[in-house]
């Protein structure tokens, strides 16, 4: 083999051999087979019915919905999360195997929505309970937006490094806290503000001649009727 054949051999070898790392291979296998756990509590969850249909067909992305968190690596939260449901959501997330991802779908999941204005039992954003990878705003988001969020998550999985994700989760871990109500001093004493109440004059303050004159006029009126 002479020196002229070396470049041809190098080009042939480069076109025939795929060079990659175990990390890239792992990311490729995970982004092509996401198994989501659907956690829906409100109207945003209805949009998933359109995704299952033939028009959008989210099975082409390798999505296989699971009913058990131990078999899922993606959880899609849709709808309002209340204080009572917060421990259940955190428990489901902790039961999912690593690596795991979260998509927050809808305004109620991201910020609490319109229910967080006057409600004391609504969580103001699911990211206060579990780490969120992709935020999907809308009320409700369209099925096309859900597919776009899944596409962005696939791109994120393709370029992430597993060791760095584990390290960041250990440093920025979300701990659950019990919601406790503290009994404070009551501001209601049971006494009404006399200045705000209308007090009718008592009979002792009315002159006798006025009182008897009024009583006689009422009696004569009743007799006429």
Curated annotation (Swiss-Prot):
[4Fe-4S] cluster binds at residues 43-44, 108, 139. Its main location: plastid. Its EC number is 7.1.1.-. It is found in: Plastid, Chloroplast thylakoid membrane. It is a peripheral membrane protein. NDH shuttles electrons from NAD(P)H:plastoquinone, via FMN and iron-sulfur (Fe-S) centers, to quinones in the photosynthetic chain and possibly in a chloroplast respiratory chain. The immediate electron acceptor for the enzyme in this species is believed to be plastoquinone. Couples the redox reaction to proton translocation, and thus conserves the redox energy in a proton gradient. NDH is composed of at least 16 different subunits, 5 of which are encoded in the nucleus. Belongs to the complex I 20 kDa subunit family. This is NAD(P)H-quinone oxidoreductase subunit K, chloroplastic.
């Amino acid at each position: 083999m002479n020196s002229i054949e070396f470049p041809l051999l190098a080009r042939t070898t480069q076109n025939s051999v795929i060079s990659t790392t175990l990390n890239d291979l792992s990311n490729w296998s995970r982004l092509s087979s996401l198994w989501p756990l659907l956690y829906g509590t409100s109207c945003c969850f209805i949009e998933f019915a359109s995704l299952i249909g033939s028009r959008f067909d989210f099975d082409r992305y390798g999505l296989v919905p699971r009913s058990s968190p131990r078999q899922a690596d993606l959880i899609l939260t849709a709808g309002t999360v209340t204080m009572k449901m917060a421990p259940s959501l955190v428990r489901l997330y902790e039961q999912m195997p690593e690596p795991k991802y979260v998509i927050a779908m809808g305004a109620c999941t991201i910020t609490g929505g319109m229910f967080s204005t006057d409600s004391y039992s609504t969580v103001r954003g699911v990211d206060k309970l579990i780490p969120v990878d992709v935020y999907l705003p809308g009320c409700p988001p369209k099925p096309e937006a859900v597919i776009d969020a899944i596409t962005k998550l696939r791109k994120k999985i393709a370029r992430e490094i597993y060791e760095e994700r584990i390290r960041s989760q250990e440093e920025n871990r979300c701990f659950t806290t019990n919601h406790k109500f503290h009994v404070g001093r009551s501001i209601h004493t049971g006494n009404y503000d006399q200045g705000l109440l209308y007090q009718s004059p008592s009979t002792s303050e009315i002159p006798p001649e006025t009182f008897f004159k009024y009583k006689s006029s009422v009696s004569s009126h009743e007799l006429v009727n």
